[in-house]
């Protein structure tokens, strides 16, 4: 079975969000279970630098100009690079310039990604033809539209990592990307009078996946559907919409061999966790108190992530003698809000604006509780890291957070099911009460260690996800 993943990021070469982490792990896990998986993505500077040895597969001109398709390998995984310097030779973020303006030619840059993915199912590489083209997020959404326009020579799967980003462009660009005007209608590419690359992926694919079962349900509702809930409800009723959880890359995220932390540990030997807590407190110049309940948050600073809820309820942590460290960047008013907290309570709250991979690992290894109070969260990865590292997740019951964390109620603790703290409503009081519950459990260390042990025993490996996708591909291929 030959599967081509079409995407715009690949960890660790280029990352702006969780999509890169998925692409840096899922294809490798699929190879381990016998799938011939490859990736196609634009040859951004960081990608070319990370895969310097390539051969030319094809050279051609199309609607996007002169294109060279190259093939190389990254850690043994086959990767096609779409080499078009006039489109992709731009340093930094792959989607926008340094002033956060989307590139004006994004419609063409990402149409080309979808077009090449479809062509790789029909002979663009004479040595390898994809049986399944698996596109990820709006950037690759047109792949299934091009396949549809070619008579569906391969099966197509589209994964929604975040429905909020829809890739919408003016109608007049349709003639510039090689698709017929007849595809621009409500049963097709059209959304609110524009071309939607995300809707193309939803409408024309043979199957659509969301990155957790709960998120797959949520996006069929007006609250989470972003105007597409009608289409998604139809797909769900047709059996075309499924939720498959993301996994954790054990090679990168495991407390017993994490390359970024000095003190390793595992379930039966937890001394290293205490030492990481000391190191984290020292890094942020907080009192090195082993008895202080240490909360950590590694996130984009946005309302989606519930950062405003934390700002409004952080005094509960202060009042109960806890500590809070935050790493992230985002909305200026939220950055200002958490910096104000740190100035107000310098011995209990510390903040670093920006992103630091090594520090993120230390925070997840050294913290006692990881905060993920998101308003919505398609899957979420940090709570999975928290489980693996024995840093109990405190989450809102949404998306993948609801699928992966079990609330520490008395009954769940007795049944050895509890793995963290869960609150329902996206408001200050609900989060504050969850913080109170965390402090209450912290006072009962024997029970805390029980919950922590159950958390660390959870298995959210990529092998499970890869097996789920394999079953989906097999089902589609059996429909020939």
Swiss-Prot record:
Family recorded in the similarity comment: Belongs to the glycosyltransferase 1 family. Bacterial/plant glycogen synthase subfamily.
NCBIfam families for the chain: glgA, PRK00654.1-2
An individual GO BP term: glycogen biosynthetic process
Membrane-crossing residue ranges in chain numbering: none
Organism encoding this protein: Pasteurella multocida (strain Pm70)
Catalysed conversion reaction: [(1->4)-alpha-D-glucosyl](n) + ADP-alpha-D-glucose = [(1->4)-alpha-D-glucosyl](n+1) + ADP + H(+)
Protein name (Swiss-Prot/TrEMBL): Glycogen synthase
Keywords per UniProt: Glycogen biosynthesis, Glycosyltransferase, Transferase
